[in-house]
């Protein structure tokens, strides 16, 4: 049976099989440690019965309560290829949403490559909608052009009027994101 548990420092040396996916954003060890130190409850790993890491979600709480922008943010969600199509990503998202709800968030948001239609469709099935397009959010390699992202959001119960998910009428640039 799969177990979902808090991510630990030791997991940093065990999750390469998950991060080898070209659509997964990878970061340096200090970045992961910062999340682990500041938002440990938002950093969850799925582990197979034999101890193999199957996937993880890394997020944080951010924004302004006064402006009704306090929310959970999904920084990274990735499942190893051999464990996809089992509902694991949906379960990890559900856990992060529950944590954000308990922390009084108005919504949960994430960024996803416009070209990653499989992920976009999954997020839509989970109740997320495109809030805005962010032009050239993802840096490209090999001389390719930078790629746009969708900022997708799902309102939580605190946002009774669903104001947080009203789409913006125009795209924005990365420097315009607060």
From Swiss-Prot:
Keyword Cytoplasm in annotation: yes
GO MF term list: protein N-terminal-methionine acetyltransferase activity
N-acetyltransferase domain: residues covered: 2-157
Pfam family, one: Acetyltransf_1
Main location: cytoplasm
Keyword Nucleus annotated: yes
Residue ranges of the region described as Disordered: 159-178
Domain of life (superkingdom): Eukaryota
GO biological process: N-terminal peptidyl-aspartic acid acetylation; N-terminal peptidyl-glutamic acid acetylation; N-terminal peptidyl-glutamine acetylation; N-terminal protein amino acid acetylation
EC number: 2.3.1.254
Assigned GO CC terms: cytoplasm; nucleus
InterPro entries named among the record's database cross-references: Acyl_CoA_acyltransferase, GNAT_dom, NatB_acetyltransferase_subunit
Catalytic activity, reaction form: N-terminal L-methionyl-L-asparaginyl-[protein] + acetyl-CoA = N-terminal N(alpha)-acetyl-L-methionyl-L-asparaginyl-[protein] + CoA + H(+); N-terminal L-methionyl-L-glutaminyl-[protein] + acetyl-CoA = N-terminal N(alpha)-acetyl-L-methionyl-L-glutaminyl-[protein] + CoA + H(+); N-terminal L-methionyl-L-aspartyl-[protein] + acetyl-CoA = N-terminal N(alpha)-acetyl-L-methionyl-L-aspartyl-[protein] + CoA + H(+); N-terminal L-methionyl-L-glutamyl-[protein] + acetyl-CoA = N-terminal N(alpha)-acetyl-L-methionyl-L-glutamyl-[protein] + CoA + H(+)
EC main group: transferase
Location relative to the cell: Cytoplasm; Nucleus
Sorted UniProt keywords: Acyltransferase, Cytoplasm, Nucleus, Transferase
Family to which this protein belongs: Belongs to the acetyltransferase family. ARD1 subfamily.
Function: Catalytic subunit of the NatB complex which catalyzes acetylation of the N-terminal methionine residues of peptides beginning with Met-Asp, Met-Glu, Met-Asn and Met-Gln. Proteins with cell cycle functions are overrepresented in the pool of NatB substrates. Required for maintaining the structure and function of actomyosin fibers and for proper cellular migration.
PANTHER family assigned to the protein according to its UniProt record, in alphabetical order: N-ALPHA-ACETYLTRANSFERASE 20
Complex formation: Component of the N-terminal acetyltransferase B (NatB) complex which is composed of naa20 and naa25.
Name assigned to this protein: N-alpha-acetyltransferase 20
Organism: Xenopus tropicalis (Western clawed frog)
Lineage per the UniProt record: Eukaryota, Metazoa, Chordata, Craniata, Vertebrata
Gene: naa20
